[in-house]
Amino acid sequence: NTKAKLKNHPLAHLLSVRPNEAMTPSVAKKLTHCNILLGGNGYQIIVRDSINARPRELIPVPYYSIEPFFDTSGKLWYLYTNPRTGEMRRLNQFDVLHYKAYSEDGITGISVLTRAQETISTARAAQRYENKFYSMNAQPSGVLTIDTSLAKEAKDKVRAEWERIHSGVDNSFRTAVLDLGMKYQPISISNKDAQFIESKAVTVEDISRFFGVPLYKLGAGKQSYDSNEQNGIEYISGTIHPYISQYEEEDSYKLLFDSELSRGMWIKRNM
């Protein structure tokens, strides 16, 4: 039941020093995780030694450049399209590290933005509503009335002149001067409309829920515990650990040989 770090293992340098010629391990990890969060899938192509098939390079690629598919026999493959050249290659599933966000089929992940689309659309609508509301000096629309009838051209002219003088923050608190016989009746804002404007404030909580990040880390809400250590443990177990577990499982299965797995070897990431 003892555990030992294999510092001289051929994968040690690849994982902790240089995964490929262009990137450090931290850059490769951040790039891959960014693709998971924004695209639902993080991919790294495994370049193997032509003689012993040992992984020689790990190359992160954009989530949109790879598409999983099954052949007629039911075997899983990955179709890779080079973003620079347009060249297409079919890759064996064991030559692609595939990390997923939430998935409905276990093959393709769904991005946070896709799952949050409805809420984001509502928040954007609330933002546009609020901008329009305050561009009108935070005043609801109203009705100008006059005892006599006006032609359409005359109505448009009166409306345009009124909005020019009284709309906008810069025209706040200006005194309205009405022509003889003209009256202005404001239309009060409903409680429902007021709540819709305030709804924009809950989007911070939405972001917290979508990404699984505690509210206090986004500058809102309170910490769950008085101890920073306990809050750190909660963040690791609730937010980080689900991803780390997936990384370790995928890395161990595809980077180690079957003979190594049978001897109890596995790849563990530091947290």
Label every PLM stretch briefly.
Residues 1-196, 202, 206-209, 213, ...:
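Structured, contiguous alpha/beta core segments that scaffold functional sites
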